[in-house]
């Protein structure tokens, strides 16, 4: 019983330390200059047309972590690090199968697309671009062919390096 109490105490100290270390970063994010540069709906459209690729990219990174740090094989076997697997699988579940404001299950990426469509962003090209990125073997060449800004291409190529 004492071991459990010590473990819980150590976990609380560890989590509190993480929270304290994150606070300055959260403040920096809250005060980011980007918030001051978006002054109109057109500015927001420009931003979201680029940012949508980061939303999709995050899910790709998350799936990479899930593949490499959890068990997704058949036959199934226990994960070597169940705490990490639990965290990753919880994030995946939230990102892939959250509920929108109407209670409809959908991914955060799909919610983002719905959101930007609501203020006039056309998402057809975005979806065509993302759907064309379907092979890791050719992804760098496929990214290069996309009709998007070079900085977005660089961002995506960095992820898939």
List each language-model region with its residue ranges.
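Alpha-helical bundle segments that constitute or directly flank the non-heme di-iron/ferroxidase center
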Residues: 16-29, 39-78, 94-99, 161
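Histidine-centered active-site/metal-ligand motif
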Residues: 32, 51, 104-108
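Active-site-proximal alpha-helical scaffolds that flank and shape metal-associated catalytic sites
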Residues: 86, 90-161
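Non-cleavable N-terminal signal-anchor transmembrane helices
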Residues: 14-29, 113-116, 120-127
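Short, well-ordered alpha-helical segments
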Residues: 80-86
